[in-house]
Amino acid sequence: MSVLTPLLLRGLAGSARRLPVPRAQIHSKPPREQLGTMDVAIGITSCFLCFLLPAGWVLSHLESYKKRE
């Protein structure tokens, strides 16, 4: 690395610090209807079945994937 590299990096970082950072104005309304216990249970169960179950099956059968037959 050159001797000038730290000076260049410091110069770039200094000018980047002065730039304004745009902030998102996110506002949310209250929900139209509250979720019930059954709705939450169905949502969590479907997430488990769709994402975690296939991943668990693949991980449990990883040794059979490694073997070449």
From Swiss-Prot:
Q: Provide Mitochondrial intermembrane-side residue ranges.
A: 61-69
Membrane topology recorded in Swiss-Prot or TrEMBL = Single-pass membrane protein
The transit peptide is at 1-25
Which cysteine-cysteine pairs are annotated as disulfide bonds in the entry? none
Pathway participation: Energy metabolism; oxidative phosphorylation
Location of motif SIFI-degron in this chain is: 2-19
Q: What is this protein called?
A: Cytochrome c oxidase subunit 8A, mitochondrial
Taxonomic classification: Eukaryota, Metazoa, Chordata, Craniata, Vertebrata
Native organism:
Carlito syrichta
Summary of the function given for this chain in its UniProt record:
Component of the cytochrome c oxidase, the last enzyme in the mitochondrial electron transport chain which drives oxidative phosphorylation. The respiratory chain contains 3 multisubunit complexes succinate dehydrogenase (complex II, CII), ubiquinol-cytochrome c oxidoreductase (cytochrome b-c1 complex, complex III, CIII) and cytochrome c oxidase (complex IV, CIV), that cooperate to transfer electrons derived from NADH and succinate to molecular oxygen, creating an electrochemical gradient over the inner membrane that drives transmembrane transport and the ATP synthase.
InterPro entries membership: Cyt_c_oxidase_su8, Cyt_c_oxidase_su8_sf
Q: Quick one: signal sequence residues? A: none
Looking up Gene3D superfamilies in the UniProt record yields:
Cytochrome c oxidase, subunit 8 (4.10.81.10)
Family affiliation = Belongs to the cytochrome c oxidase VIII family.
How does the record describe the protein's post-translational processing?
In response to mitochondrial stress, the precursor protein is ubiquitinated by the SIFI complex in the cytoplasm before mitochondrial import, leading to its degradation. Within the SIFI complex, UBR4 initiates ubiquitin chain that are further elongated or branched by KCMF1.
Report whether Ribonucleoprotein shows up as a keyword of the record: no
GO cellular component terms listed in the entry, alphabetical order: mitochondrial inner membrane; respiratory chain complex IV
Q: Name one GO biological process term.
A: mitochondrial electron transport, cytochrome c to oxygen
| Segments on the Mitochondrial matrix side according to the record's topology features | 26-36
